[in-house]
Amino acid sequence: MDVRQSIHGAHAKTLDTQGLRNEFLVEKVFVADEYTMVYSHIDRIIVGGIMPITKTVSVGGEVGKQLGVSYFLERRELGVINIGGAGTITVDGQCYEIGHRDALYVGKGAKEVVFASIDTATPAKFYYNCAPAHTTYPTKKVTPDEVSPVTLGDNLTSNRRTINKYFVPDVLETCQLSMGLTELAPGNLWNTMPCHTHERRMEVYFYFNMDDDACVFHMMGQPQETRHIVMHNEQAVISPSWSIHSGVGTKAYTFIWGMVGENQVFNDMDHVAVKDLR
């Protein structure tokens, strides 16, 4: 488990390139036949990836001491979106087939969660967010047909994109976790511009669907003290509540967003005009 401390905005603005990457970038999300796990003290979110190829993968009691529990989801809820080939997630003996861009919400209290790929030639890539939970909501599969798509932006401003809301109150109940997938239209490069912060929630972005020769300049920092982190395919970045979170790519890309915090009101944002950015 890679543990990241909370950080004040006044401290963050003093960091150099490597300092910013050390604090906020999750450089390696998928490792064959293993799970990766980054624990952030910012709202205590856990993010990572699971890519089973030759064997099943599960999170065992080895994390219990670090989390102060007997098993991973004793006091947590889990959201998973599969960006790879078809796979299965077995929750306490109940098997769910999770295809490409299918998702699974797993409620607090699930003791055994086992991940597997159906075809080792095209393994599943399960990206997950995990947050503290106060009660148990039912485990539920969500398919792309069930999400709430919203198309925003314009080709003229290079920010036309479709936001697919997987785990939001209109689709299913969770304690605090919200997740979704945003896909830029071909030829569009910007996400979340004009940008915003939200003091009541933190957020994690996971960028993917990027060619090897492409990158995204992820914009972060306080609106009057902006910085950037260069992101490559299948990397994630932590965004504190005081930070903007936007990006511009060398080509179109897709990203998964996950939020935890005070509420689940998607439009509860503190908007920042482009003219006010520094």
UniProtKB/Swiss-Prot annotation:
Keywords: Isomerase, Metal-binding, Zinc. Zn(2+) binds at H196, H198, E203, H245. Pfam families: KduI. Binds 1 zinc ion per subunit. Gene3D superfamilies: Jelly Rolls, pectin degrading enzyme 5-keto 4- deoxyuronate isomerase, domain 1. Its cofactor is Zn(2+). Its EC number is 5.3.1.17. It is an enzyme of class 5 (isomerase). NCBIfam families: PRK00924.1. Belongs to the KduI family. This is 4-deoxy-L-threo-5-hexosulose-uronate ketol-isomerase. It comes from Shigella flexneri serotype 5b (strain 8401). The lineage of its organism: Bacteria, Pseudomonadati, Pseudomonadota, Gammaproteobacteria, Enterobacterales.
